[in-house]
A protein has these predicted regions:
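Boundary at the C-terminal end of the N-terminal hydrophobic targeting segment
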Residues: 18-22
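Bacterial N-terminal signal peptides
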Residues: 6-16
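Short, contiguous alpha-helical
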Residues: 30, 34-41, 51-89, 128-174
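Hydrophobic alpha-helical segments
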Residues: 17, 40-41, 64, 104, ...
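Acidic/histidine-rich alpha-helical segments that form the ligand environment
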Residues: 43, 95-129, 135-151
Length: 174
């Protein structure tokens, strides 16, 4: 009897562990998006409003364009992953800092809600992305995290070129 109870406890424990780890890919994506939200929103807040027109070279995006691009990409990719229709945003890179930062925060909030609907079992489904090109949802999820990492490094460089520390370089409490 004790052996049967022990086996049942072990079966339930293992099945609970398996259930908790049933979406390791999307759980990782959600974690990365949350971390990048902190960094990118922090960078957008750190850059002074008068520097939103800054660009290191004529060929590069302005900081305002960067904030707008991240916001639009978040809405597009998170909608594609969740099966929603991407929102049509009315943003310009020359919009006020307060509007661009609020839109970025809203885009990350939307991604949190949208990505909560996505699980690993659907990552093989095809979605249409830019230019009507198709890719698996897994590719869109990786694209989202890559895009956020790429643009945070860009934002960090823009901040440093203006004598400011990016959020990830600050000590706790700074």
């Amino acid at each position: 009897m004790k052996r049967t109870i022990g086996v049942l406890v072990l079966v339930f424990a293992v099945s609970g562990l398996a259930a908790a780890q049933s979406n390791p890919v999307m759980d990782s994506v959600r974690h990365i998006v949350q971390r990048q939200e902190k960094n990118l929103v922090g960078a957008a807040e750190e850059m002074p409003a008068e520097k939103y027109g800054f660009r290191p070279t004529a060929q590069q995006m302005t900081f305002g364009t960067l904030v707008m691009h991240v916001t639009e990409s978040n809405h597009f990719l998170c909608a594609k992953l969740s099966g929603d229709t991407p929102a049509k945003l009315e943003l310009k890179p020359t919009d006020a800092k307060t509007k661009l930062v609020a839109a970025m925060k809203s885009s990350f909030s939307y991604c949190g809600t949208a990505l909560a609907k996505v699980n690993d079992s659907g990552l093989g489904e095809q979605v249409k992305v830019w230019g009507g090109r198709e890719m698996p949802k897994a590719g869109a999820a990786i694209g989202l995290t890559d895009d956020l990492a790429d643009h945070y490094s860009q934002a960090a460089m823009y901040l440093r070129l203006n004598g400011l520390l990016p959020p990830s370089a600050k000590k706790k409490g700074e």
